[in-house]
């Protein structure tokens, strides 16, 4: 996974060149985290790679489909997501080489590489589950699969979200976050019915329903738009949105014009 920015800048010289280019299956970057040289966001055949030559490249398989054109402009470069929702490639602490150029209010944001090769920045954070942050070591042998729910999507058995040993799933009609290693229930909706599904609404509210009847809601609504619910590395579930910035590498070349994608 990515490093917190303060930690990354302290340990950068010690770890550069030691990370495998396929070292992570994460495809979400949170505010305050960075991708350093050799690290990636990876979702299926798509990979956003921060390379040792300072360039940020989006790959489809082994084919580059977009780049930030920052190659050769430093040897201590990293990708970061700022508290104003701006995505930046920097060298050193403050020298910006590339920017998404879209800024919002100070808060917590999330960058997602989806399964179709699109990048999106969502924020601010609208809601978070009430359980405490988990601070134990994650199971490195557990493969991270699907851990993001997009607005308009339903989560119903047997589908579940899973990040390492954390799972968001239904136990009968009760939506729970569970530590799969210890079998502990970290959070739950305490809902009860014969059949249920969870849905992330287009106003950002997370709901549990039975045949369209509302059984539970997060009670945090925003303006209509695309939102995401993310099962985090600390065992909590966060909702971010709406979508602030997006980029589809399939629709841009590797020219400098592709360095500043569109605002939503």
Language-model segments: what does each one mean?
Residues 2-264:
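Beta-rich ligand-binding surfaces for carbohydrates and other polyanions
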């Amino acid at each position: 996974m990515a490093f917190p920015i303060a930690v990354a800048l302290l340990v950068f010289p010690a770890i550069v060149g030691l990370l495998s280019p396929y070292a992570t299956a994460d495809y979400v970057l949170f505010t305050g985290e960075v991708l350093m040289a050799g690290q990636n966001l990876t979702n299926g055949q798509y990979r956003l790679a921060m390379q040792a030559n300072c360039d940020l490249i989006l790959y489809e398989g082994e084919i580059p489909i977009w780049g930030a054109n920052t190659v050769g402009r430093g040897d201590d470069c990293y990708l970061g997501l700022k508290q104003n929702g701006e995505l930046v490639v920097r060298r050193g602490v403050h020298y910006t080489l590339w920017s998404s150029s879209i800024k919002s209010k100070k808060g917590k944001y999330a960058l997602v590489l989806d399964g179709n090769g699109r990048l999106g920045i969502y924020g601010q954070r609208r809601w978070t589950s009430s359980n405490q942050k988990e601070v134990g070591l994650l199971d490195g042998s557990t493969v991270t699969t699907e851990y993001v729910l997009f607005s308009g999507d339903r989560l119903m058995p047997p589908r579940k979200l899973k990040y390492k040993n954390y799972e968001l799933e239904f136990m009968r009609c009760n939506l729970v976050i569970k530590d799969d290693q210890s079998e502990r229930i970290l959070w739950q909706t305490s809902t009860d019915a014969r059949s249920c599904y969870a849905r992330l609404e287009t106003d950002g509210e997370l709901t549990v329903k039975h045949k369209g009847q509302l059984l539970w809601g997060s009670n945090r609504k925003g303006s209509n738009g695309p939102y995401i619910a993310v099962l985090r590395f600390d065992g909590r579930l966060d909702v971010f949105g709406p979508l602030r910035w997006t980029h589809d590498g399939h629709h841009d070349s590797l020219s400098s014009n592709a360095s500043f994608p569109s605002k939503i």
